[in-house]
Amino acid sequence: MKLLHAIQTHAETYPQTDAFRSQGQSLTYQELWEQSDRAAAAIQKRISGEKKSPILVYGHMEPHMIVSFLGSVKAGHPYIPVDLSIPSERIAKIIESSGAELLIHAAGLSIDAVGQQIQTVSAEELLENEGGSVSQDQWVKEHETFYIIYTSGSTGNPKGVQISAANLQSFTDWICADFPVSGGKIFLNQAPFSFDLSVMDLYPCLQSGGTLHCVTKDAVNKPKVLFEELKKSGLNVWTSTPSFVQMCLMDPGFSQDLLPHADTFMFCGEVLPVSVAKALLERFPKAKIFNTYGPTEATVAVTSVEITNDVISRSESLPVGFAKPDMNIFIMDEEGQPLPEGEKGEIVIAGPSVSRGYLGEPELTEKAFFSHEGQWAYRTGDAGFIQDGQIFCQGRLDFQIKLHGYRMELEEIEFHVRQSQYVRSAVVIPYQPNGTVEYLIAAIVPEEHEFEKEFQLTSAIKKELAASLPAYMIPRKFIYQDHIQMTANGKIDRKRIGEEVLV
């Protein structure tokens, strides 16, 4: 596999270059290669037979976990990343559904809840195996699964998205070729490794010979701590959700002065608000900003566009860009028929980045994946349209609601609320106590203002909204907060916000 061979070459050519670093920890390319060899040999001793069962890797982003990822695939097994935010009950379901036989964990972690269901070993114990390696013909093959990411399932049980070595290689080659990330750059990692945004940091970094700078969980939740850490990092490449960088932008100190070497920002996982893009262009004039799009089932991202002031001026919402060269993206109607350019429907992705399907879930796989003109395709469940070859994503089809007979997109309403001069950030939640939407609630982080009463602020925002939205799309209720709740993955936590707002 090209990715693994590239890491091996870096280990031989630049053995003392850091592949990974975090507070007080580092791992050179030579150490990464040699330790992952030892881990692979130890794994093969623990799991006998031809069955290539998945291996759970449990912990947080640190050297031994990356060693465990590579050790697993060198031993011929896919890995399942499980970070500390995943509750034990969910881990037990993942073990049961995946058929995993081995769990590798970081030192000092309590795993009592799953200990009886699966063989467990600390990453440190694996590395006690002196010497040892496996031959390259034991590595995960191109058509075999490299990693499995578990996402939420509509049944309440997590579903495992299988990403093959070929899927990952297609993605990594694209990032290294089409984005300014090569040449030993320093990449940010802030996403937990059970979220596939972390794949955008990790593997392009390792293939290009860069250094992955992982910020601590404490820093992720505290901007002041984060900025102190980043100031010393020499960071070049920033990858995150828009929500995470929006939180950083709330501090005026987040700018090119803080990160003088930052030259590339890449966003994925959510809609990139125009206001965030504008602020970044102002704060980081030396950097290029890229909006990307893709579901986990299509290996992180499959479209991109560089965001400039010219791009911003051409449309109310930002495009997610053009398909990567080896992919085909089209729009389908409810009957599964392709739609012409400009018409709205469901985004469908076809090509070598599309997952082989859900592990052990043939019915779910058949529902979401299908063959299209000789290519494997995935129905995303995202609404969008194509204009002049560029894809515009309009959020989830299941973010569409019906209120008083009108069908509307929550994200369209959010866009207009965020455009208000009085709004720093906002989320719109439907109030539907009996399954039917009765009205809309806007949860808002306000800008500084001179109003003495909240109702005065609400009136001012509603007056602005009335200029761009019909009355039935304007939220009835406005709730003011000091921040917008986010999930461990750095996305807006709509479920939690809804629960808090409705109390």
From Swiss-Prot:
Keywords: ATP-binding, Cytoplasm, Ligase, Nucleotide-binding
Name under which the protein is recorded: D-alanine--D-alanyl carrier protein ligase
Catalytic activities: holo-[D-alanyl-carrier protein] + D-alanine + ATP = D-alanyl-[D-alanyl-carrier protein] + AMP + diphosphate
Main localization category: cytoplasm
Gene Ontology annotations of biological process type: lipoteichoic acid biosynthetic process
Reported function: Catalyzes the first step in the D-alanylation of lipoteichoic acid (LTA), the activation of D-alanine and its transfer onto the D-alanyl carrier protein (Dcp) DltC. In an ATP-dependent two-step reaction, forms a high energy D-alanyl-AMP intermediate, followed by transfer of the D-alanyl residue as a thiol ester to the phosphopantheinyl prosthetic group of the Dcp. D-alanylation of LTA plays an important role in modulating the properties of the cell wall in Gram-positive bacteria, influencing the net charge of the cell wall.
Taxonomy, superkingdom: Bacteria
Coiled-coil ranges (or none): none
Signal sequence segment: none
Gene: dltA
CC annotations in GO: cytoplasm
Enzyme Commission identifier(s): 6.2.1.54
Disulfide-bonded cysteines: none
Native organism: Bacillus subtilis (strain 168)
Family affiliation: Belongs to the ATP-dependent AMP-binding enzyme family. DltA subfamily.
NCBIfam families, A to Z: AA-adenyl-dom (TIGR01733), D-ala-DACP-lig (TIGR01734), PRK04813.1 (NF003417)
Subcellular location field: Cytoplasm
Pathway membership: Cell wall biogenesis; lipoteichoic acid biosynthesis
Residues engaged in binding D-alanine: 196, 300, 491
